[in-house]
Amino acid sequence: VAPGAVAAGAVAVVTDAAGAELLAGLPVPLLVVADVRGVAGRLAAFVYGEPAEHLAMFGVTGTNGKTTTSYLLDGGLRRAGRTTGVIGTVQILIGDQVVPSVRTTPESPDLQAILATAVEKGVQAVSMEVSSHALAYGRAAGIRFEATAFLNLTQDHLDFHADFEDYFEAKAKLFTPQYTKRAIVDVDDEHGRRIVERCRANGVEVHTFSVKGVPADWSAQDIDLAADDSTFTVVAPDGSRHKASAGLPGDFNVANALAAIVMLAVSGIELQTAIAGVGDVHGVPGRMERVQIPGQGFLAVVDYAHTPDAVQTALAALRPLAERGHGRLRVVVGCGGDRDKAKRPMMGAAAVRLADEAVFTDDNPRSENSADILAAVTAGADAELAGAAQNYRVVADRAAAIAYAVAASRPGDVLIVAGKGHEQGQEIAGVKKPFDDRVVLRAALEASAGTGAAAGSGAEAEGEKGRSEQ
């Protein structure tokens, strides 16, 4: 790579000590550093003219909720008249231009190039997901955010981080003066309360929020949850009360909405404008996304929930809707291969604990044997049931699992297909094939109603999202 870069005009190479030995014959200076990734962000920012300094940057981190909160932020910024950009898991938006997203937070040279393009296009504010991988690798170096939000921290990515504390420390890096001017923290999460302590110790301005009655600067009260949206009252630090809404179901989306509102309000956006803009957002790709056909009779949604906590939270949010319709709550879910193995039994346990029926299926097995992954998931389910009647079945083929769940659903029921959300491919044995849960679910609904073809892989979908990071 380095010789090719030099041939293309590079005037110097940044490398580490091992690389310096291999590249000793190059006719350009070698800048030897201990951590190449650690300096790449600052170098890239310099090369591209420090684009983040010309943008109002908003960063969101947490195991769950980053994508939704970023889209809600974007809604508020647009309502305030800003030209906006969004960088995250689903896609990259530069104004109204859509760019495919390979990872949650791009590598630092790519990220700085994207920000430079945003400046050229007249973008004024950017909402950005910041993953623990990005913080560990220094991808966000060269950016100082107007505001950053901490949403939550739960089991995930222990295939990458040494342990849970290492995962926390990676997230905590975002809440230092190097990265942020002000922090907005959910203190319903115990790790959020630790982040507050870090902020105060580091001299970072911090604003807390809660949707569960924990003492905080901002809170959501009078929460009313419906199948498609939620309404609530924002209680500001001065005690004033403001009606608000989130165009997404679930109390966790009230938390996401409140996070976005607070980020905007403490960064100079008028509170009523922030509330209205967040309420403008009625749907985020693959996040509690409703799929329906005429005469369906039951609620069916696709969600990205792919951690034990996310599955539990999603099911807890949908349970009242099933009870309201005197129906059953059913979940289709699996676990990805070549990733955090410790969460597999926990996923199975969460599914059988909160659903009336769980259908365990393939997610992205990648290089692993599907049966081994499903065995770990069902082991967790069996342990949770502790001899009680089995309320799950295994259907390895994902399209068949979705078709079964649709056929089993009756009026008043609620069905959630969890784990892949917006993804448009499935990786099995190193081969990526088109697969979109939304397309497959719709086909299954139409087939069950006798109005369409049998559910397949969703071959209409194109592309394949890369590795997800939290």
Indicate residue ranges for each PLM-predicted region.
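N-terminal leader/targeting and accessory segments in enzymes
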Residues: 1-42, 190, 221, 241, ...
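Short, basic phosphate-binding NTP loop
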Residues: 1-61, 68-81, 217, 226, ...
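Short internal beta-strands
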Residues: 7, 11-17, 183-187, 332-333, ...
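Acidic, Mg2+-coordinating active-site environments of NTP-dependent enzymes
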Residues: 15, 19-26, 121, 127, ...
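Short, ordered loop/turn segments at secondary-structure junctions
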Residues: 17-20, 89-90, 132-133, 153, ...
